[in-house]
C-alpha cells in the first residue's frame, strides 16, 4: 500500500509540471545579415550589452539593449485573451515584464508581427497606466492591461502585461519573436507590474514555487521551460544548489573562472546572472578580450568574433567554479558553429556590482547545465544536461 501511495505521489508530481516547448529559429542577427541590414543596425545601436541590467529607476523604466536578443534562437508560444491570441515570445530570466505588440502600434516592427487586439478578447481589462522600456535607438512605449495568459496548460487569469504602441527602429521588423515574457523577480519589473510566474504562484496554478529550463544543443525541438516542477530525465547526477545573492535578477556568486587550472578572471570571486534571455556568455571587457585572444578569435565586419572551427579540437575547457562545484564549458560549447563558420560564444561588457565584477551566464552556459529557478528558497539549481 505504501508503494502504491508513493507511485501515486510521483505520478501526481510529474503531472503537476507544466511544460512549454521551445522551438529554435534563425536569430535576429542572422535575419539582418540575410537582408543586408546588420551593419546599419550595429551603427545605430548602443554597443553596451550591459544596458539590460540594473536600470536607474526600475519601477518606471526598464533599460534593455536589443543587442541582448540579437542571437536568441529559443522561442515559445503563449496565448493572451479569450479566445487566446497567439504570440511567440522569449522566456527571459533576465527581465520581469510581459509585453507584446498591440493593434495600437503602427510601427513597422509591429506590422510584421502578431498584434494583440483587446476588442477581440472578452476578458481584457484596460488601464491608463503607461509602460516604457528603453532601447539603444528609442523606446518601446505602450499601456498596461489585464487578461488571461495561456502558458502551456496554465490559464493565468488577471495577468498584467504591456501592449506596445511604438517599437524602436525598423530592425525589430525582422525579429523572430513578437514579445518578451520575463521570469526574473518583481523587484526589477517596469511600472511595478506583477511578473507572470508570480501571478501563477499567487493564484495557486503551480504546485511548486519554481520553474526549470532545458535548452537542447542541436535539435530544432526538444528545448523546454517547465513550470511548477523538475523533470530529472533532462539532467544527469544531482542538482547543486546555489543561493541567490541579490534578489532581482537570478544573481549568484561565482568562485572563480579558470582555464588549464589557471585563473583567467574572477580570482577573488564575482557575481553572475543566469539569463535565458542572453544568448552568449558575457563578462568584463578585459577578461573577455584575453579569452578571445587566447582562443584565437578576431572581429569580422559584422562585429562577431570569428574563430577557426578546427580550434574546437584543440582548445581547453573554461571552468566556472560555483559554490565549490566546477562547471566546465568545453570548446564545443563556447564556440558556436553554423553554416557560415564558427564564432566565439563570449561577449565583453563592463558592469561592476557592489559584490564585484559581473558575468552573464546565457544560453552558451545553460545548454550545458539544466537550470532550476527556485523562488521558494531563492536559489538556482544546476546539473549537467543528460
UniProtKB/Swiss-Prot annotation:
* Disulfide links within the chain: 105-110, 266-270, 309-342
Name recorded for this polypeptide? Pepsin A
Assigned protein family: Belongs to the peptidase A1 family.
What is the annotated signal peptide range for this record?
Answer: 1-15
Encoding gene (name): PGA
Lineage at the top is: Eukaryota, Metazoa, Chordata, Craniata, Vertebrata
Entry-linked Gene3D superfamilies: 6.10.140.60, Acid Proteases
Which SUPFAM superfamilies does this entry report, sorted A to Z? Acid proteases
Catalytic activity reported: Preferential cleavage: hydrophobic, preferably aromatic, residues in P1 and P1' positions. Cleaves 1-Phe-|-Val-2, 4-Gln-|-His-5, 13-Glu-|-Ala-14, 14-Ala-|-Leu-15, 15-Leu-|-Tyr-16, 16-Tyr-|-Leu-17, 23-Gly-|-Phe-24, 24-Phe-|-Phe-25 and 25-Phe-|-Tyr-26 bonds in the B chain of insulin
Q: Name one GO cellular component term.
A: extracellular region
Sorted alphabetically, the keyword list is: Aspartyl protease, Digestion, Disulfide bond, Hydrolase, Protease, Secreted, Signal, Zymogen
Annotated compartments: Secreted
Main site of residence?
A: secreted
Query: Which example biological process does GO assign this protein?
Result: digestion
**Xref: InterPro entries:** Aspartic_peptidase_A1, Aspartic_peptidase_AS, Aspartic_peptidase_N, Pepsin_A, PEPTIDASE_A1, Peptidase_aspartic_dom_sf
Protein function: Shows particularly broad specificity; although bonds involving phenylalanine and leucine are preferred, many others are also cleaved to some extent.
Annotated Peptidase A1 domain residues = 74-383
Source organism per entry reads Canis lupus familiaris (Dog)
Molecular-function GO terms, alphabetical: aspartic-type endopeptidase activity
